[in-house]
């Protein structure tokens, strides 16, 4: 039987050494599922609530024992006996139990851990891999990796404003070949940086965090690394950015502080458009502040026909904010982070709403991760076609890539790679 027998949570540590929630769900037929919850560094103000203990004497206030207790008492009691294969009902029960718009009462980290573990348990009970359980027999598209090879902003202790400089190996037929390409570029970039006298220490997401002279220098060294790895920029490999503009936007003045310049919204749009003219940039995430809808509209009008414009802090995996973007013609893609909204059901709802309206979706990690690889299965299950899960270092990032390699092997000849489809979309 797929009825929930028991739910247990514990406090574990994420990739930054901060506490996070891990949940285990056991069904009456003996099947079990486990999931761990990620955590972000640059978080949008509209995200679901991550419940921390706040006791500064323990883990500097970042403990999650309250969230763990909520799982082991209130949530466990409410869900016992429910059918794990009815994910929507399970998630709705937790939403109603919490009773707040942003899951502040129980904590989105408590609710999400259970939601993901329930999906894993149901998949195990039905003897299916998670991607097939969630996506059905037609789930066979491997996502193009957005490989974060230079970290800046909130993800690194350096002078680079842009949070992530990524490479996207799109011009390949198989995911495994694309992953090899990105990895080879990463290793070549290490030598390029070392030869220039820069540090090759890595940031939270496994990319290098050199103290470069400017954001543009980051683009230049990446172009050099692509060439030295033997690949062609703009034909096989493209560049993607996560500006995380909210982090350098002053709401009182309406100015963006970038490269030691104060820019208006119009100037920010022109600045990003200029980069797209000079470099093979295929995607820009959070190019504007999370609530600067006016500048977002201008950016979409200017370059949205040739560049993927991704809403992360803008949409926070929330169908209401995404619907506003759709209605107003703002952005053309949504970043999917399970902990921004807090349940598997709401995450899938956001992906499906995006796809119905011609928006792309990207399954994404957070800067604070664990060995949990749920987002890899989710990317294949929902045919997102793209995944953002860090660089070619740190085992918390490799866990997702390695899971995708296993899925590709399992699918065999049926496997598709999403890179060429996305390349066609941006090149026409």
UniProtKB/Swiss-Prot annotation:
GO terms for cellular component: cell surface; extracellular region; phosphopyruvate hydratase complex. Its cofactor is Mg(2+). It comes from Rhodopirellula baltica (strain DSM 10527 / NCIMB 13988 / SH1). GO terms for molecular function: magnesium ion binding; phosphopyruvate hydratase activity. The active site is at residues 205, 337. InterPro entries: Enolase (IPR000941), Enolase-like_C_sf (IPR036849), Enolase-like_N (IPR029017), Enolase_C (IPR020810), Enolase_CS (IPR020809), Enolase_N (IPR020811). Keywords: Cytoplasm, Glycolysis, Lyase, Magnesium, Metal-binding, Secreted. The gene is eno. (2R)-2-phosphoglycerate binds at residues 163, 337, 366-367, 388. This is Enolase. PROSITE patterns: ENOLASE (PS00164). Its EC number is 4.2.1.11. Belongs to the enolase family. Catalyzes the reversible conversion of 2-phosphoglycerate (2-PG) into phosphoenolpyruvate (PEP). It is essential for the degradation of carbohydrates via glycolysis. Mg(2+) binds at residues 242, 285, 312. It is found in: Cytoplasm; Secreted; Cell surface. HAMAP family: Enolase. It catalyses: (2R)-2-phosphoglycerate = phosphoenolpyruvate + H2O. GO terms for biological process: glycolytic process.
